[in-house]
């Protein structure tokens, strides 16, 4: 789990115009909430935040919000639908040692058995882990799995200290037979002539 330090500054202006001015200045408007505190509005440096959010479930250490640093998890990220720029972020305050529920990407390793194709039902699994020990991904070894095999959430090998937070019977991936190739027009015409 990676921790990234980001300097935050309190936001005093609100509304669409203020948010646009902040974005033009290279800042991203954000709201900080959780642990019984009143929601606080802050601005974060856009470039630093963009780089930090490239890591799944990154833990941010905000400086400049309180006397002490705040540990937060990005809960909701809004992006421009065309350009992909960050528009707004909701941040959840967490404590060291506190368990949180997050979605962790599944990392497929290996090749399925001959004639099979891996059908990925879910790209992420919901797990409960300490805020400072969230895994970056869960490896799933599919090497040599035969056709008809289902991998359920309960089959996932979770790191120490991480618990499953979803139904263990949920199918996350399965091995199916390859689809037969469609016949070309020439082959169909040849069969029809016979």
Curated annotation (Swiss-Prot):
rRNA-binding recorded as keyword: yes
Pfam families attached to this UniProt entry: Ribosomal_L25p (PF01386), Ribosomal_TL5_C (PF14693)
Gene3D superfamilies with a match to the protein in the record: Ribosomal protein L25, beta domain, Ribosomal Protein L25, Chain P
Gene Ontology biological process: translation
One GO cellular component term: cytosolic large ribosomal subunit
Keywords: Ribonucleoprotein, Ribosomal protein, RNA-binding, rRNA-binding
Molecular function terms, GO-annotated: 5S rRNA binding; structural constituent of ribosome
Superkingdom to which the source organism belongs: Bacteria
SUPFAM superfamilies registered for this protein in UniProt: Ribosomal protein L25-like
Assigned protein family: Belongs to the bacterial ribosomal protein bL25 family. CTC subfamily.
Annotated function: This is one of the proteins that binds to the 5S RNA in the ribosome where it forms part of the central protuberance.
HAMAP family: Ribosomal_bL25_CTC
PANTHER family: RIBOSOMAL PROTEIN L25/GLN-TRNA SYNTHETASE, ANTI-CODON-BINDING DOMAIN-CONTAINING PROTEIN (PTHR33284), RIBOSOMAL PROTEIN L25_GLN-TRNA SYNTHETASE, ANTI-CODON-BINDING DOMAIN-CONTAINING PROTEIN (PTHR33284:SF1)
Subunit structure: Part of the 50S ribosomal subunit; part of the 5S rRNA/L5/L18/L25 subcomplex. Contacts the 5S rRNA. Binds to the 5S rRNA independently of L5 and L18.
Name the UniProt record assigns to this protein: Large ribosomal subunit protein bL25
Upper taxonomic lineage: Bacteria, Bacillati, Actinomycetota, Actinomycetes, Streptosporangiales
């Amino acid at each position: 789990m990676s921790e990234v330090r980001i300097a935050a500054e309190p936001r005093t202006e609100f509304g669409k115009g203020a948010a646009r001015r902040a974005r033009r200045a290279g800042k991203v408007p954000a709201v900080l909430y959780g642990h019984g505190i009143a929601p606080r509005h802050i601005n974060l440096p856009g470039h630093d935040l963009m780089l930090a959010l490239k890591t799944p479930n990154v833990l941010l250490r905000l400086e400049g919000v309180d006397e002490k640093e705040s540990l937060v998890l990005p809960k909701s990220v809004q992006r421009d639908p065309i350009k992909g720029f960050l528009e707004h972020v909701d941040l959840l305050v967490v404590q060291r040692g506190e368990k949180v529920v997050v979605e962790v990407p599944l990392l497929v390793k290996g090749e399925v058995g001959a004639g099979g194709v891996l059908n990925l039902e879910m790209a992420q699994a919901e797990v409960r882990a300490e805020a400072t020990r969230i895994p970056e991904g869960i490896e799933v070894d599919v090497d040599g799995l035969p056709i008809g095999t289902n991998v359920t959430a309960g089959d996932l090998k979770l790191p120490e200290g991480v618990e499953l937070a979803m139904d263990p019977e949920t199918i996350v991936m399965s091995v199916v037979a390859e689809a037969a190739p469609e016949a070309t027009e020439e082959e169909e015409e040849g069969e029809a002539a016979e």
